[in-house]
């Protein structure tokens, strides 16, 4: 009987990127409104210029509970980062709602895409490296590579993406699964999921650990 693998979220982010020429939120207003809504605001490294001058910001901007607000004004990106797949969608929706209702900026009206980036750890029942070497559908391929290199060879990881798609497309995902370099009985997994449709990204985030677990279970059977 196969033991269902335990999937742990190490880090996950959820962000919106807009098509605006300039970042659509005034940083001064954003700091004030977030503070009123219980966010801890990161101190500025330089003073804010007088209005209406545009202010560039990058990286850690504020924090509330377990999530950090990240901002990239050059890329028109606003997002959250933390370690809870289960709660990040709700926290992200709260952040967007604050922007729309209290700053009167409708980010969704000019959205370019939404994106989630996650890193995960998965406990293996035996050596993760060994399990890649046992993938029967890859044995012939591995043998051909061995013949080229004249060195015993096996897979060290797998990467999945949409069929016939390229990474510079808006509708995109990639899932990397590979042995944890420091813990041989664990898999590591990195995921990027991007779409113009928020529902698609939210659905992925809500199911991420279950889907990753299913991928690992399929590998056990191959």
Annotated model-derived regions:
Residues 1-71:
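N-terminal low-complexity, intrinsically disordered segments
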Residues 14-21, 80-84, 121-124, 191-196:
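Short beta-strand-to-loop capping motifs
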Residues 17-28, 88-91, 126-132, 199-205:
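Short, conserved charged micro-motifs
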Residues 34-40, 96-107, 213-216:
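A common structural junction motif
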Residues 63-67, 99-103, 171-174:
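Short amphipathic beta-strand starts and helix->beta connectors
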Residues 71-113:
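Aromatic- and glycine-enriched beta-alpha-beta binding-site module
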Residues 112-188:
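Aromatic/basic-lined ligand-recognition segments
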Residues 167-222:
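Mixed-charge, glycine-accented linear interaction segment located at domain edges/termini
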